[in-house]
């Protein structure tokens, strides 16, 4: 189903579009969380810590895939909004060709420098080998990660958020089943977790690719279209590169934070690993609504209806606030039960560390959703410089405050840095949003 954001009230279209996207991300995150849960429950605290220690590094690789997703989504949204179906197909094939080349480079780099990266963040020695093993297997799946994210970006640009959900339902179930077989039955430990993810991503990517190209056959008619278009390549990367830089900056910040966490031993690392997965689950739910706003904004700009964008922004704020409240209640009121999903009762120190993180960070979700909705509008409008610039203070403040607070409050002080970074980033993003509105005129 293709959604046109340029006609109906956003209260209707954004809600209908967001729900399948939200479930897609939920299932994607569920099998990420399942990796950690099964590792912690069946392979032990050190296995959970090893997967968790490598997680900030995998997020850097993910940043490239998400950047290509965004680049393809915004460019295709504009072409689709303008009614240029031939352009849509050329932009899609260009995005795939570019992403395959990028995936090859990242795979080679990740494999040969995995041990160096784990050493740079001072990974505890008792989990170092497992962390490196997990990372090496993970990078073999870069081609699938890239392909799936570009497919998802194109489906989103065309207003179809249901198709990616169907693929994720199957691959999520498959990933969990494979986790249980490889880790609980075969006792492959961390390697079993990594291979389960690799296989699940591969199935999802191939199915998404086949479905997308079968759907695009009608877009260009019988006339043969060029597979690669230099102009669309430049447009895609003009959006993708700032997004990659923005997310990489965040990921580097997370690496610095992980470095600080690692100094407190594998128990704190394990607790942080579980808590950060829960935090990421919530944040990604909110981010999907921001992605909806990007498509909404890009389509309306392409159709010459930019005056509809502030209306969509207000709808996004309302929906995101409603989504944030249950997570705040769950993570603050039931933090022990949440950490119990990952760790057995004997891992008391790890559970306590994770509970502290959730109780300190989760109440601020009601603020970060404002930034994420504003980010969605700014990305869709193509103002990527502002989008990137609002991220830097979050990074700097989070690292500085983590260093300062940890000296007096130990690992608890690290978690206290999150709200300060979010406050600065939210204020800056709102300032940039107002500038975008003034510069464009129609966004007033």
List each language-model region with its residue ranges:
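Small-residue-rich hydrophobic transmembrane alpha-helices
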Residues: 48-108, 145-164, 271-335, 368-382, ...
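Helix-terminus/linker motif at the lipid-water interface of multi-pass membrane proteins
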Residues: 30-48, 118-125, 181-188, 248-277, ...
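Transmembrane helical elements of multi-pass membrane transporters/channels
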Residues: 16-35, 137, 148, 171, ...
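Hydrophobic transmembrane alpha-helices of multi-pass small-molecule transporters
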Residues: 60-63, 107, 175-180, 204-209, ...
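Small-residue hotspots at the loop-to-helix junctions and early N-terminal turns
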Residues: 43-56, 131, 135, 194, ...
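Short runs within selected transmembrane alpha-helices of multi-pass transporters and secretion channels
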Residues: 69, 138-156, 164-172, 193-208, ...
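Short alpha-helical transmembrane segments in multi-pass integral membrane proteins
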Residues: 1-18, 76-141, 185-241, 297-363, ...
């Amino acid at each position: 189903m293709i959604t046109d954001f340029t006609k109906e009230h956003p209260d209707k279209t954004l809600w209908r579009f967001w729900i399948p996207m939200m479930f897609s991300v939920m299932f994607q995150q569920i099998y990420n969380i399942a990796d950690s849960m099964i590792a912690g429950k069946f392979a032990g605290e050190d296995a959970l810590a090893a997967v968790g220690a490598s997680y900030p590094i995998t997020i850097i690789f993910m940043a490239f895939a998400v950047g290509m997703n965004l680049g393809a989504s915004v460019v295709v949204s504009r072409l689709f909004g303008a009614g240029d179906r031939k352009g849509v197909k050329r932009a899609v094939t260009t995005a795939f060709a570019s992403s395959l080349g990028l995936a090859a480079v990242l795979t080679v780099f990740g494999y040969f420098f995995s041990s160096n990266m784990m050493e740079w963040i001072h990974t505890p020695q008792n989990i170092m080998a497992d962390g490196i093993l997990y990372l090496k297997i993970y990078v073999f799946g870069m081609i699938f990660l890239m392909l799936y994210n570009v497919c998802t970006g194109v489906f989103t640009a065309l207003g179809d958020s249901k198709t990616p959900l169907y693929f994720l339902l199957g691959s999520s179930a498959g990933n969990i089943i494979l986790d249980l077989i490889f880790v609980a039955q075969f006792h492959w430990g961390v390697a079993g977790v990594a291979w389960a993810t690799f296989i699940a991503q591969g199935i999802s990517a191939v199915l998404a690719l086949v479905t997308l190209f079968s759907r695009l056959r009608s877009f260009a008619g019988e006339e043969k279209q060029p597979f690669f278009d230099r102009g669309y390549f430049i447009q895609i990367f003009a959006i993708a590169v700032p997004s990659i830089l923005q997310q990489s900056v965040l990921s580097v910040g997370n690496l610095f934070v992980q470095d600080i966490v690692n100094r407190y031993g594998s128990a704190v690392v394990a607790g942080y690993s579980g808590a950060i997965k829960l935090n990421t689950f919530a944040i990604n739910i909110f981010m999907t609504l921001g992605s909806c706003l990007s498509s909404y904004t890009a389509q309306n700009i392409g159709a010459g209806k930019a005056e509809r964008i502030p209306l969509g922004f207000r709808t996004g704020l309302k929906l995101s606030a409603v989504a944030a409240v249950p997570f705040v209640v769950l993570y603050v009121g039931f933090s022990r039960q949440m950490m119990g999903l990952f760790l057995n009762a004997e891992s008391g120190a790890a559970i306590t560390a994770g509970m502290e993180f959730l109780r300190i960070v989760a109440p601020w979700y009601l603020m970060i959703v404002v930034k994420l909705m504003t980010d969605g509008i700014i990305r869709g409008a193509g103002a990527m410089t502002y989008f990137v610039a609002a991220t830097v203070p979050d990074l700097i403040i989070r690292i500085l405050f983590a260093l300062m607070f940890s000296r007096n409050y130990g690992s608890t002080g690290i978690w206290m840095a999150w709200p300060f970074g979010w406050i600065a980033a939210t204020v800056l993003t709102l300032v940039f949003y107002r500038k975008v509105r003034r510069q464009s005129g129609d966004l007033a």
